[in-house]
Amino acid sequence: MNSKRTFILLTVALLWIGSGSAMALGNRPGDQPGNRTQVRLTRKDRLWDSHLLKINFIDKSPESAGSKIYHAIIPDPDTYIRSVAREVMRTLYFSPHDSIPECKVLDYILRSDKGISAKGGGNGFVNIFYSSDWVAKSFSNGDTARVDFETRGVLLHELTHAFQLEPQGIGPYGGPNKAVWELIEGMADAVRVAAGGFHGEQDRPKGGSYHDGYRYIGYFFDWVRRNKDKNFIRKMNKSCLEVVPWSWNGAVAYALGPGHDIDALWHEYQVAVGDIKADARP
């Protein structure tokens, strides 16, 4: 990006931030944009925060255009990350008193990378990298709102991996049972969809299968949440504790009641959103 153009666009970004046009850190999913840097925490907010102890923000490319853009839009990364973490936990759990994995240390790393973002670590010590190259690309037309929206959406997904429960009794992520990968990645996108981190219908993948994970499951879960049970995402997350060994049919029956199964539910969803005809075989 041309340095002079970057300076001009960053100046615009800073003026935009100063006008209070960024999204409020204290917002609940679906709230309107406000000021990211000023938030009054409630007692319940602090209870959610107790599951995320220390954040180390590490900028490995401070001279890059992406880094400068990031800091112009997000001047207080610690407050920002904690706010998004609260959104994630509120979407996954009924209460801050639930069995929520504790994140003792989160290393959030801004660096030059061809990938967009990824979560690593475990057992309470988590690292998430976010690409400064991607930030610069998102800002290519001087679109601060796009950077803000994309950064929050990506963080919703990655922080879900830090706080979600994982299926028990069927092996690890990356093992022979693909259902583990399907649920873990699908749940992360379900949280992102439910929290307004995608662009609605235009980002919904058409057709496919719940076995395709990610947005396929994300939009599917959100449809069930909106049309059948507002706590569906929370219950599917909790099924990882209650359904052992975990299975798709067992989890759906746990969430919606006996007699429900994953294939019939997916078929109903596909018909409802117009991806298949009603007389198509499940």
What are these regions (language model features)?
Residues 2-11, 19-54, 281-282:
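N-terminal low-structure segments adjacent to metalloprotease catalytic domains
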Residues 89-109, 170-179, 200-206, 231-239:
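Surface-exposed patches in mature extracellular/periplasmic domains of secreted proteins
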Residues 174-217:
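Post-HExxH zinc-binding segment in Zn-dependent metallohydrolases
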Residues 217-282:
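Pan-zinc metallopeptidase signature
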Residues 25, 63-133:
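Auxiliary, metal-adjacent structural segments of Zn-dependent hydrolase domains
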Residues 165, 189-197, 226, 230:
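Glycine-rich, acidic and aromatic/proline-enriched surface loops and short helix-turn segments
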Residues 134-155, 170-180:
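Short pre-active-site segment immediately N-terminal to the catalytic Zn-binding motif
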Residues 153-166, 185-189:
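Active-site recognition of the HExxH zinc-binding catalytic motif
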